[in-house]
């Protein structure tokens, strides 16, 4: 762990919304009297009917989480309408296309009109409050319009990352019984064309075989590429919008009405539908956006995340727009047309805050400094990281090379389930350590707990838990409250178990050490090992599969697969490549296998349980620390696995 302290820059401290003294005062208030603290900060959004109840939460028994439960509001109203009187002509959204020559700026007035038209299209097609709408779109302005249109009329959106396959889409459609889909003909991502409508057509067929029938598909024209068309089911957005009205009243939404479902990987292989509701989520993401990014009116803020992930929901769309900010949406990738794209965008749009993933930082760091040095980046004030812990080397490169030693780095730890930032520096309050997420946000009570359930004090390492609720917390797993309780509240009774390991140093700084369950964090995206194993075993040549993570210089964690073959099948380069393509087809390109090791047997206990601990060590090339292997049914299997390992680089 890095012990060098990076002080708060004087110019940041001078103008910051929160200094160290205010942080300490507010944090104490938020812990000592959360009811009063969140009653005050709940006023940051506008209410149609004010709340009288603030916090009604329990982590025990049936687990119930309610915030501002008798208040009535609307998320889209707060993100658009309330800004129109004073800021209607301010830029709400800057869109930077995949092509460097394509961009557009949308004011709050224009955003209002786009969202109302979109909402009226949904209503014209019978979509109503409580209906689930699947959104499978590239990073185009219509993706933001679609989300906000759902929020405006009270429909529950389920956004699916545009890299997911037909099978993964179908899983999500079936789970939430969505019958209305919004997609595009195709998507552009770097030099690749993504056949979105084609994927949706296949997903609809799969869902139908599983008993869920999609009735309507709204298609946005992005490339004008050739697509299949089902008359009576498929509708063109550009045709529908031409006769849609430009005004649509915001639905009266109870504070605890669902806002969206976002699916995240589960250790059983079945994706979990994380449910976020209306008011508490919006209070929390707008507050964290304002204070974590020290947002001042007029600044240009850029979160590089895709809308298919929680970062895109909370810190590209809802948090910034609720605060009346200018938020930048980028369709492309950081390395297209070359590795200077991020820095060109920063200069072109005079970006003040850049919030991106360690994966992107490592990839750009690997390209050398020349691309960075050819840009000015003088507009940058703050840098942020999200999605996974950032290693100190990448942190320092980001700080020194990109930020010219003057931009604080906001290393934020949080989850799809938490809704917003949980452990994070505040620019004007927090001295930094490279690789540490530093301190908890207001209202966040952390505990580090050992394997026996003992709470560890002072300098310690163990499992990270949160002992009380916060407004942005997920409320349940969609249609599976039992799994919600089992997943998050059964390991340590009365506490939210994050599934992450954590260290606290002697200065009280927190360091996230990574997942301690069977979830991989690949390029900041969570993938269940069970889901990948299921995909592998569905291949006719595969008898058994076990998947583990290993340190990857770019992606954080790589995907290492151990596979045993069916009788009569022999390993080959062709099969190796076929397995990679098969998993991509089953799950999506995000699940790109990095290493495949063919093995006659997997290490199993006498009861038949695969010893993943051993596989992890071998994948990490750390086989000197295998521990006790005497419980294996056939200990000699380990020697073969070590001899044929695919990763021969020692762990850091």
Curated annotation (Swiss-Prot):
It catalyses: acetate + ATP + CoA = acetyl-CoA + AMP + diphosphate. Pfam families: ACAS_N (PF16177), AMP-binding (PF00501), AMP-binding_C (PF13193). Keywords: Acetylation, ATP-binding, Ligase, Magnesium, Metal-binding, Nucleotide-binding. CDD domains: ACS (cd05966). One of its GO terms (biological process) is acetyl-CoA biosynthetic process from acetate. CoA binds at residues 189-192, 311, 523, 584. Its cofactor is Mg(2+). This is Acetyl-coenzyme A synthetase. It comes from Bartonella quintana (strain Toulouse) (Rochalimaea quintana). The lineage of its organism: Bacteria, Pseudomonadati, Pseudomonadota, Alphaproteobacteria, Hyphomicrobiales. The gene is acsA.
């Amino acid at each position: 762990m890095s012990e060098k302290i990076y002080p708060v820059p004087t110019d940041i401290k001078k103008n910051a919304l929160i200094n160290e003294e205010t942080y300490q005062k507010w944090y104490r208030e938020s812990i000592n009297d959360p009811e009063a603290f969140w009653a005050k900060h709940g006023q940051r959004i506008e209410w149609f009917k004010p709340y009288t109840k603030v916090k009604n939460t329990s982590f025990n028994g049936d687990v119930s989480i309610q915030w501002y439960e008798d208040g009535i509001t609307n998320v889209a109203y707060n993100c658009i309408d309330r800004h129109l009187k004073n800021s209607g002509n301010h830029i709400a959204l800057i869109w930077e296309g995949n092509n460097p020559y394509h961009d557009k700026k949308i004011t709050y007035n224009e955003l209002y009109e786009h969202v109302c038209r979109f909402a009226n299209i949904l209503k014209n097609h019978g979509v109503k409050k409580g209906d689930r709408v699947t959104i499978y779109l590239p990073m185009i302005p219509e993706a933001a319009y679609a989300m906000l249109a759902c929020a405006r009329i009270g429909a529950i959106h389920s956004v699916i990352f545009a890299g997911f396959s037909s099978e993964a889409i179908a899983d999500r459609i079936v789970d939430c019984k969505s019958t209305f889909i919004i997609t595009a003909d195709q998507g552009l991502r770097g030099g690749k064309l993504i056949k979105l409508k084609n994927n949706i057509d296949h997903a609809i067929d799969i869902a139908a075989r599983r008993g869920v029938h999609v009735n309507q598909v709204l298609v946005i024209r992005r490339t004008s590429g050739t697509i299949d068309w089902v008359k009576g089911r498929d509708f063109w957005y550009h045709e529908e919008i031409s006769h849609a009205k430009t005004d649509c009243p915001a639905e009266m939404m109870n504070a605890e009405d669902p806002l969206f479902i976002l699916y995240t990987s589960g250790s059983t292989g079945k994706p979990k539908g994380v449910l976020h509701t209306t008011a508490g989520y919006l209070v929390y993401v707008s507050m964290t956006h304002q204070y974590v990014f020290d947002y001042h009116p007029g600044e240009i803020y850029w979160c590089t995340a895709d809308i298919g992930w929680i970062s895109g929901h909370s810190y590209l769309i809802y948090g910034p727009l609720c605060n009346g900010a200018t938020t930048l949406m980028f369709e492309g990738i950081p390395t297209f047309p070359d590795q200077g794209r991020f820095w060109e965008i920063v200069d072109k749009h005079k970006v003040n805050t850049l919030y991106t993933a360690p994966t992107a930082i490592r990839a750009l760091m690997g390209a050398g400094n020349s691309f960075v040095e050819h840009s000015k980046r003088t507009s940058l004030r703050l840098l942020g990281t999200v999605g996974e812990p950032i290693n100190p080397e990448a942190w320092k490169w980001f700080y020194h090379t990109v930020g010219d030693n003057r931009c604080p780095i906001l290393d934020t730890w949080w989850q799809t389930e938490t809704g917003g930032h949980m452990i994070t520096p505040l620019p004007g309050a927090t001295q930094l350590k490279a690789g540490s997420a530093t301190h908890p946000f207001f209202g966040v009570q952390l505990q580090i707990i050992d394997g026996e359930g003992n709470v560890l004090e002072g300098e310690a390492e163990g499992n990270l838990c949160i002992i009380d609720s916060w407004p942005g917390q997920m409320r349940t797993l969609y249609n599976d409250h039992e799994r919600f309780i089992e997943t998050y509240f059964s390991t340590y009774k009365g506490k939210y178990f994050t599934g992450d390991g954590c260290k606290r140093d002697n200065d009280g700084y927190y360091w996230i050490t990574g997942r301690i369950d069977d979830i991989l964090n690949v390029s900041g995206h969570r993938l269940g090992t069970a889901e990948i194993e299921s995909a592998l075993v569905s291949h006719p040549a595969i008898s058994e599969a076990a998947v583990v993570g290993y340190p990857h210089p770019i992606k954080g964690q790589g995907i290492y697969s151990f596979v045993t073959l069916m009788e009569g099948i022999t390993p080959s380069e062709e099969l190796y490549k076929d397995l990679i393509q098969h998993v991509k087809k089953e799950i999506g390109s995000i699940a790109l296998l990095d290493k495949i090791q063919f093995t006659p047997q997997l290490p199993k206990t006498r009861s038949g349980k695969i010893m993943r601990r051993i596989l992890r060590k071998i994948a990490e090339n750390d086989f000197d620390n295998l521990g006790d292997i005497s419980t294996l049914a056939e200990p000699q299997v380990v020697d073969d696995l070590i001899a044929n390992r695919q990763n021969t680089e020692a762990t850091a």
